């Protein structure tokens, strides 16, 4: 995803936004995977276009541009790194089931602010497929509040009783079983016809 500041191009009254995509597929220099304009063998038909939501958003002078969240289970710490459009005070508030468990503030310097918050011992709730617990976080700037969420979980590779390396989630062996689904939607290729179609 990417964004563009179009402030300088806006005019009073009605404006029109035109979004276009040009893709040379295997005739261009960009990465393309196994797509070719002339498919065959292991190569799939070329596809390009707008396949995710495009929108206009009015933002204040100081707004969140990017947020990175990194959990560390052994230390009960979660690190937040935020990029903002201009230097300002940034507040980080973590809640678990509506209860505040961590809060910190930092001033962005060169459009960057970061904090490491340690969760109280009684607030550590690790994520798993059987217990998909999520924490909520509010990132507050002078004129904007952004909400997101994260999970506390740790992936490791540890030997089992026979010395065979196993993937472990939060210290417990877990079987990873994936599916390679290279099917495309008939009408939209990458874009499904509806949210319901993705579930079935």
How would you name each of these model-derived features?
Residues 1-63, 86-87, 99:
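Accessory beta-strand-rich segments of carbohydrate-active enzymes
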Residues 16-19, 131-142:
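Short, aromatic- and glycine-rich surface loops/edge beta-strands on solvent-exposed regions
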Residues 22-29, 142-145, 171:
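Short acidic/polar inter-strand loop motif in beta-rich domains
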Residues 57-62, 66-68, 145-200:
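Active-site-adjacent substrate/metal-binding segments within catalytic domains
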Residues 10-14, 27-29, 119-134:
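Short glycine/proline/serine/threonine-rich loop/turn segments at secondary-structure transition edges
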Residues 2-8, 112-122:
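Exposed aromatic-hydrophobic patches
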Residues 70-76:
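Short, solvent-exposed loop/linker segments at the N-terminal edge
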Residues 76-107, 113-116:
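Beta-strand-rich binding/interaction modules
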């Amino acid at each position: 995803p990417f964004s563009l500041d179009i402030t300088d191009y806006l005019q009073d009254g009605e404006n029109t936004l035109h979004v276009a995509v040009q893709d040379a597929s295997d005739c261009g220099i960009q990465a393309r995977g196994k797509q070719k304009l002339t498919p065959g063998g292991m190569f799939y038909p070329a596809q390009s276009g707008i396949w995710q939501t495009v929108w206009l958003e009015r933002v204040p002078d100081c707004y969140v541009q990017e947020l990175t969240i990194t959990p560390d289970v052994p230390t009960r710490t979660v690190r937040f790194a935020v990029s903002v459009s201009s230097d300002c005070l940034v507040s980080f508030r973590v809640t678990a089931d509506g209860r505040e468990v961590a809060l910190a503030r930092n001033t962005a310097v060169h459009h960057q602010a970061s904090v490491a918050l340690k969760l109280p011992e009684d607030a550590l709730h690790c994520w798993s497929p059987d217990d998909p617990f999520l924490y909520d976080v509010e990132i507050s700037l002078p004129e904007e509040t952004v909400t997101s969420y994260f999970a506390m979980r740790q992936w490791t590779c540890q030997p089992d009783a026979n010395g065979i390396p196993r993937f472990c989630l939060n210290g417990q062996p877990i079987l990873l079983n994936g599916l390679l689904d290279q099917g495309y939607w008939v009408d939209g290729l990458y874009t499904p016809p509806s949210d319901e179609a993705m579930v079935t």
